[in-house]
């Protein structure tokens, strides 16, 4: 139905604890597998966004979970990179919580989960968990924090294929709109908002790689004409 309505890709968000009970995760895995099969049948790309959590630890933004997060992200990436799921691109969280990375501008001083070098290693190790293309999501970080974390990914020589962020680039415009209205909002977006996007683009230009590089370059990509019969 989505394809009939004009969708050119499908994106699914999945809350996932890789260490949860098997009966819970087997249902989630079957759900993703079914969507992957349908996307393959309809010849549309499948983007999966797994967000990790653990109810036993609690607060996903807290220090305790921050210390466990790299392993959880790596396990989720490893699982959903398996061919049976048919995921074309993983949209993944940063493997670290920026607030707890000592030695960075993002560090809040409210506890340390990792040093800067350890964070770089976590970027490298989690990226090694998948053999397919993936992009990072900002998860509501500020544009400055998100760009700094992408710079760490570049230091780790991570072959990520870009980023997807929304409010990281425009969230500071909300109070401007509340105080001064639509005209001020549009002015902010045309000025600071544009600067935020350009700054992100500059970071991506230095660190991100094309998705086809994962497969050895564009020349190794076999282009197959879509089967129009599948869309009727």
Enumerate the predicted regions with their spans.
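Short hydrophobic alpha-helical runs that function as membrane-insertion/retention elements
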Residues: 11, 46-48, 135, 162
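Alpha/beta enzyme core
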Residues: 1-10, 16-45, 53-132, 149-156
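Conserved, mostly hydrophobic/aromatic
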Residues: 49, 90, 166
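Charge-patterned, long linear interaction tracts outside catalytic cores
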Residues: 218-232
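Catalytic-face loop-and-helix region of soluble metabolic enzyme cores
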Residues: 93-215, 219
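Long, hydrophobic, amphipathic alpha-helical segments used as structural scaffolds
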Residues: 43-50, 208-211
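Alpha-helix boundary/capping detector
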Residues: 29, 179-180, 226-230
């Amino acid at each position: 139905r989505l394809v009939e309505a004009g969708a050119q890709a499908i994106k699914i968000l999945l809350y996932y604890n890789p260490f949860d009970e098997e009966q819970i995760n087997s249902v989630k895995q079957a759900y993703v597998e079914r969507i992957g099969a349908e996307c393959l049948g309809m010849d549309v790309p499948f983007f999966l966004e797994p967000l990790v959590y653990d109810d036993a630890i609690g607060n996903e933004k807290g220090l305790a979970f921050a210390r466990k997060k790299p392993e959880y992200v790596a396990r989720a990436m490893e699982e959903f990179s398996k061919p049976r799921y048919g995921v074309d691109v993983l949209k993944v969280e940063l493997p670290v919580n920026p607030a707890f990375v000592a030695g960075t501008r993002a560090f809040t001083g409210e506890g340390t989960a990792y040093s800067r070098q350890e964070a770089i290693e976590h970027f490298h190790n989690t990226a090694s968990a998948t053999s397919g293309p993936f992009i990072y999501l900002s998860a509501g970080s500020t544009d400055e924090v998100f760009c700094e974390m992408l710079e760490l990914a570049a230091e780790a020589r991570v072959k990520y294929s870009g980023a997807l962020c929304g409010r990281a680039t425009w969230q500071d415009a909300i109070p401007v709109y509340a105080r001064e209205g639509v005209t001020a909002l549009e002015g902010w977006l045309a000025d600071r908002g544009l600067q935020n996007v350009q700054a992100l683009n500059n970071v991506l230009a230095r660190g991100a790689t094309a998705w086809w590089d994962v497969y050895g370059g564009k020349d190794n990509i076999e282009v197959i004409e879509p089967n129009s019969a599948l869309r009727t």
